[in-house]
């Protein structure tokens, strides 16, 4: 913690929240001149920070506490009946690890995903520059996990490999493959991978009760939520 005490942070001016438009958001960022050390990143993850591009951040809102950091303690996780069906349905998928680079194949999939699933969000319209700035970063702990069937790319789970767990940065997938539930499958796969690597948790970002796109995370039980600076387990 001594190392963390020396870090500098900066807060943004209040701005419209991208998850709850009726709220004003403030974001706390780690000083961008600070090298992104993997141990510092891991320690900050335990304090509710996330990575976006080259930045580590967490919500720092004055009048709202809706964004609750969430993680899955993988040694306690047991898939429910629906999750077992998703795992079985996707048993034909092969997963491989790749470096985070720009390829036309990745971008085409990302573009289809944003256009069909998030056309109402602040990431629309997708662009090559946006994709690269957000996801294609030359960081030693970052991975693109490719999900393929017969060489066809179905999904990419952008994941950070930390000493204390896997951080699920972002997943984009083939929007026409609804039956496969690829977003949920990617999380289940990350849980399995963290277990295989003997890591403690999968960090899912923020659970937001009143935001449909962010409240799905409590479907994975048990889950730990960071409340009053303490991780609380929900079974």
UniProtKB/Swiss-Prot annotation:
It catalyses: N-terminal L-glutamyl-[protein] + L-leucyl-tRNA(Leu) = N-terminal L-leucyl-L-glutamyl-[protein] + tRNA(Leu) + H(+); N-terminal L-aspartyl-[protein] + L-leucyl-tRNA(Leu) = N-terminal L-leucyl-L-aspartyl-[protein] + tRNA(Leu) + H(+). One of its GO terms (biological process) is ubiquitin-dependent protein catabolic process via the N-end rule pathway. GO terms for cellular component: cytoplasm. Coiled coil: none annotated. The keyword Acyltransferase applies. Keywords: Acyltransferase, Cytoplasm, Transferase. It is an enzyme of class 2 (transferase). The keyword Glycoprotein does not apply. It is found in: Cytoplasm. Its EC number is 2.3.2.29. It holds the Pfam family ATE_C. One of its GO terms (molecular function) is leucyl-tRNA--protein transferase activity. PANTHER family: ARGININE-TRNA-PROTEIN TRANSFERASE 1 (PTHR21367), ARGINYL-TRNA--PROTEIN TRANSFERASE 1 (PTHR21367:SF1). Belongs to the R-transferase family. Bpt subfamily. Functions in the N-end rule pathway of protein degradation where it conjugates Leu from its aminoacyl-tRNA to the N-termini of proteins containing an N-terminal aspartate or glutamate. NCBIfam families: PRK01305.1-1, PRK01305.1-3, PRK01305.2-2, PRK01305.2-3. This is Aspartate/glutamate leucyltransferase. It comes from Pseudomonas syringae pv. tomato (strain ATCC BAA-871 / DC3000). The gene is bpt.
